[in-house]
Amino acid sequence: KIVESYRKLYNIMGMNLRSVNIGCNSIARIVLADKSNMEKMPLLVCQIDKNFLGLTLFENGQMAFARYVPISEEDYDSDDYITEALNENIFRMEQFNKARGGSGLENVILYGFIEDYIKLVDALDGLDIKASVLGVPAQITGFENFEFTVFANAIGALYKRNKATEKINLLEVDQSTGKGGSSGMGSL
C-alpha cells in the first residue's frame, strides 16, 4: 500500500523514479563492521537517551528488527526510569526473538547517554545477559576528545554504504501489487 502511494505521488509530480532503497541504519554499519559481533548474535544494540530508547536486533549477520521507544520519568515509579525502561524493553526484545524461533539474547551492546555504566550493567544482571559498551571502530581517531557512544549514530552515517548488503529496492520487491522493475514515469 505504501509503495503504491509513492508510485502515485511520483506520477503526479511527473518524476521518473528508478528505485526506492531501504537499508541498514547508521548504527548497523558500525555494528556489522566489527566482525567480532557476528559471534554474539542474536545481538541487541540499545541506544540510551533521557527521552527514548533505540533498540536494534541483529540476527544471522544482519539487522532483523529495530524499534524506537519514547520514555519519560512519568511513565515509571522510579527515579531511575531509564534503567527500568531499558530492562523492560530488553525483555520484550528477547521475547520477540524467541517468538520467531530464536535462542534468546545473550549479548547487549549499549551506546548513547550512559551516566553510570556499572549501575546499568548491575541492573541488567537479572536478565542473564552480557552487556558491553559499543566499541570505537579502529578507523576512528581522535575519539579521546569526545564521548564516542554519544555520537555513534552520526559517525555511522559517515560510513560508506555497502551496496551489496544494504540495498532493498522496493520497486523490485513490490509483490503486493504485482508491479516491479524500475521503469515508468513517477512509479514507486
Locate the predicted segments by residue.
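Hydrophobic/aromatic-enriched cytosolic interaction surfaces used to assemble or bind macromolecules
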Residues: 1-188
